Structure formats: structure tokens, C-alpha cells
Amino acid sequence: MPAASTTGAPVAPSLALLALEPLRGIADYCASLLTASPKAHGDGHPVIVFPGLAGGPLSTRPLRRFLDKSGYVAYDWGQGLNTGPDGDFDDWLDRLDDLLVDVHSAHGRRVSLIGWSLGGIYARELAKRSAPLVRQVITLGTPFGAMADANHAATAWRLLNGDTSQLTPGLQARLRQTPKVPTTAIYSKTDGIVPWRACMEQETYCSESVEASGASHLGLGTHPKVLRIVANRLAQPEGEWRRWDA
């Protein structure tokens, strides 16, 4: 599947999809309560979950609970509410890297990183700078192909931080670069907040894009298909990563 950058400029989701996001997010959560446990069972390795913009421990709790029940050791990102990078971007990543180092040391195993929306940017960048500590990266609706525009999350970022001046052309080009660890980008064509094309990864020997059809942006952490994809990806033996084959 081609990268987002080769399919034309990303277009912001319609206002109708945006307006329906809260209700659809609730519906996705309710659907997850009725979903059977995944067939794939984990090997106990640690997973850090990074929330989306304006999200925090509460928003990722259902996903972390799912991971724990699936046989992993799930960690919150430890920074409270996600209002965007605080100060210099790389200094901010240093703080997140400290948690990655601590979790890796505690388990003596590589750590999988799951990032929802903006949280996926953190996961990808940590994997680029600390690849030996990272087992794989999974992003949920992360618009690394168009962070500064064409998405309603950028508007929210401006409301929280005043502007998107940190997102220079150089940084945006850097964010689009694929981590050199197994990477799965999950996207939904019915995402009401970010353009789905901007959430698609290049197809390489260790990266892929997987569609979670019907999922809302706010429901990406609980939608049954997303959970099935996440469970399948995490259950692959270390060093034997293969692309998704639905």
C-alpha cells in the first residue's frame, strides 16, 4: 500500500464526521465490552501506551486493561494529560525516553509502543532514537503525514498551545520518516478528526498500514477491529514480524 504522500494532499474529514465523533466513540467503547477476548495471547512483554491530544490515563485505560488481559504488561505514559510537547521537542522526548529505559531495564526485554493520534508521534520518534529498546510500534490514527494542517487535531493543538509554530517543514519531514523497527499504522477512512491518508505508513520490509474500517478517531482505542489488529501484531514472536493478513 502506498504512503500517504503518494496519494495526493490529505483532506480534512467532513464536519459531519467530526460532529458524530463523540457518539461514535461511545458506540465503539460499548462494542468493545461485547467483544470476546482475542485468540492471540501475549508473551508477557511490556507495552507503553501514549494517549492522543487532550487525552490521558483515563482515555487509554480501556486499551491498557485489554492489553493486561491479553497477556502483556501495559504502562501508562506517565505524563498526565497530553497537551502537546512541552518546550523543545527533543528535550520533551528525553523525558519520555526515560520511561522507555526504565521499563526496558525492569523487564530485560524490548518494549512495544502504542500511540494514539499525537501519541503515535511520540512512539515513532522514540523508536527512531532508541531502536535497540523497542520491539515494535503501533499507531492509531496518527497523522504523521500532515501534522500541521488538513486535520481538526491541529485546530485543537492551536487552542491548547496557541499555534503550531514548532511544526517547521524540517520537523514535519522528520516525522514522516519511518522507524527502523516493525511498525504498523492503523487508520480509519471514517476518522472524523484526522485525514486517514495522512495516517498511512510506507510499505517496507518492516512497516505497513492496516485499515480499521468503521472506527471513529475517538474510538480507536476500543474499536473491536482495532483491538483485534493490535492483539495480532503484538502476539508475533520477536524477530519474526510479518505483515497483517486479514
Each language-model region and where it sits:
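Short amphipathic alpha-helical segments, especially helix-boundary/capping motifs
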Residues: 21-22, 36-42, 70-76, 96-98, ...
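Alpha/beta hydrolase fold serine-hydrolase catalytic domain that processes acyl esters and thioesters
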Residues: 2-10, 15-28, 151, 158-160, ...
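Flexible, membrane-associating and regulatory peripheral segments of lipid-active enzymes
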Residues: 1-48, 54-70, 106, 242-246
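Serine-dependent carboxylesterase/thioesterase catalytic core
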Residues: 45-58, 62, 68-79, 85-181, ...
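Surface-exposed loop/turn and secondary-structure junction residues enriched for glycine/proline
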Residues: 29, 36-37, 56, 147, ...
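A broad, low-specificity signal for short, low-complexity segments enriched in glycine/proline
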Residues: 6-12, 35-37, 142-149, 172-173, ...
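C-terminal catalytic-base region of ester-bond hydrolases, centering on the histidine
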Residues: 179-246
